[in-house]
C-alpha cells in the first residue's frame, strides 16, 4: 500500500468568513450579519490561527478558497491581510487557483480590482437566479441588474475565470422558467456554472413555510436539461452539480473529491490532513478567545481507518463524472477494488447505475439521480 499525503504532495487551504448582510431564507450555512468591530475581531483571530498552524510546513499549496458566508462583505484590506499571512506561512504554488465568493451588490469595481492585486484569480458569484421574483422567494438581497453590474465590473477588473451559482427547483419555479434561467446565464459566457437543486434544511425559514415545490418528475427533467443546455454553450458536466468550459474546472473542489489534503481556517472550518479529519468550533466566543492555540478550537474525529479511506475514495470520487480509477485504488490501498467492493459493484452494474470503461468506474445518468443511495453502500 502506497503512503498517502507525503509532505511533497500539494495541499489546499480554505478560509471561512462567517458574515453576510442578511441570511437567505434557505441557508443553513454557518453565517450571519455582523458589524465592523465583529469583523475586525474575527479577522484578527483568523490571522492568529493561521500563524499558529503547525501543519503544512514545506507543502506546496495548489489552491486557496475564501468562502462563507459572504467574504465580499469584508473591507478589501482584510482580504489582503489574510492572503498576505497565507503567503508568509505557506508556499503558494505558481499558478495556484485562488478563489473568493462574491455576492452581487457587495463588491464594486474598486474592491474587485483590489482582489486582483492580491492575487485572486477566480470569482464565484452567488446569483442563484436571474429572475427577480425567484430571488425574492429565496430571500436574496440583490436583483439581477445588481448581479450584471458585479459581473461586468469583474470582467473589467481582469477576471477571466468566473463561476456563477444557480439554484433549481425553487418554489413556484417551472421547467420553462429553469430553462430560461440556464440560457440567460450561459449566454453571459462565464467559465463555470454550479447548478444545485434546492434543499429544504431544518431550522431555516423555508422549512417553516408551506411551499409550492416542483414535483420529482419536474426536478428530474430540470436536472437532465441542465447538462444538455449547458453543453450547447460549451460547458461539460464534470461533477454532479458542476459544469465548466474546457480546463476551467474548479481545481479546489476537485481536490476535495480526490481526497487531497486541505487545511481549513476560521469558524467551523473543516480539514483533512493525513489520516485526520477535524473541524473548528462553531462557537464564535470560543474561537475568538482561543484561535492562537489551534488544539483548543479543533474538534477532532477518530483517525481514519483504511476502511474509512477506501470508502471516501469511492463516494467522493463517484461525484465526478469521470468516476474513479481502479488502478489508482490499488495503488493507494494495495488491494484490487473488486476484492473489497465486488458485491456492491456487481449489484449496481447489473442495475446499470454504475458503468465501467477503460479502467474507470462511474455513475450512469440514472445512477446520478440515486447517487446518495449508491454511495451509501460503500460506507464501512
Where are the predicted features?
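Short active-site neighborhood of thiol/selenol oxidoreductases, capturing the structured segment around
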Residues: 14-16
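C-terminal scaffold of the Radical SAM
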Residues: 3, 8-10, 28-55, 60-335
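Minor-groove-contacting beta-hairpin "wing" of winged helix-turn-helix DNA-binding domains
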Residues: 360-364
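Local cysteine-cluster metal-coordination motifs and their immediate loop/turn environment
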Residues: 18-29
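A short, conserved structural fragment
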Residues: 349-359
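A short, polar/proline- and glycine-enriched secondary-structure boundary/capping micro-motif
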Residues: 275-277, 350, 373-375
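Short, amphipathic alpha-helical interaction segments positioned at domain boundaries
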Residues: 366-380
